[in-house]
UniProtKB/Swiss-Prot annotation:
Keywords, comma-separated and alphabetical: Cell inner membrane, Cell membrane, Membrane, Transmembrane, Transmembrane helix
Protein species of origin: Rickettsia conorii (strain ATCC VR-613 / Malish 7)
Protein name: Putative Na(+)/H(+) antiporter NhaA homolog
GO biological process: regulation of pH
Main location: membrane
InterPro entries found in the cross-reference section: Na/H_antiporter_dom_sf, NhaA
Family: Belongs to the NhaA Na(+)/H(+) (TC 2.A.33) antiporter family.
Taxonomy, superkingdom: Bacteria
GO molecular function: sodium:proton antiporter activity
Subcellular localization, as worded in the UniProt entry: Cell inner membrane
Record-linked Pfam families: Na_H_antiport_1
Length: 146
């Protein structure tokens, strides 16, 4: 797929769609064990690292003794606040009044903490859409030079 011009990250996402979900037998239990073993590592390390690396922050701006300049520091904090904190706050601050004024309801088995986790996913999803958009812009620019 990579030779066809599709980015390797998108190739892996497409391949992941073909991972079997409902399998009967011994393979199912071993696959579930592997999934349960790796889930915390993936959820709390790999996915946040992936989102951070694709958020547009260049690690060359970081130094062991601090950050190079105040303008770069402001840029980095702006990106972090906008991509991560801003999406969560926006979703929560927009949804809370609707539930409070009974314009809509949370599902019966949903708490505000669970809803907040969905708000986090909303921020991550937007960041991933920016990543995919940047891949497409790079591909379009490369095709125009041919």
């Amino acid at each position: 797929m990579v030779e066809s011009g599709i980015h390797d990250t998108l190739c892996r996402a497409i391949i992941a769609l073909f991972i079997p979900v409902n399998i009967k037998g011994e393979f199912n239990t071993s696959f579930k064990k592997l999934e349960n073993l790796t889930r915390p590592f993936v959820n709390y390390f790999i996915l946040p690292l992936f989102v951070f690396m694709n958020s547009g922050i260049l690690l060359e701006y970081f130094a062991f003794k601090g950050i190079c300049s105040n303008s770069i520091l402001a840029l980095i904090y702006g990106i972090i606040f906008g991509l991560f904190v801003g999406k969560q706050l926006g979703i929560m601050l927009f949804s809370y009044p609707f539930v409070k004024f009974k314009l809509c309801n949370l599902p019966s088995d949903t708490s505000w903490l669970k809803f907040y986790s969905i708000a986090i996913l909303g921020g991550i999803g937007f960041t991933l859409s920016l990543f995919i958009g940047s891949i497409l812009r790079l591909r379009a620019a490369a095709l125009q030079t041919l």
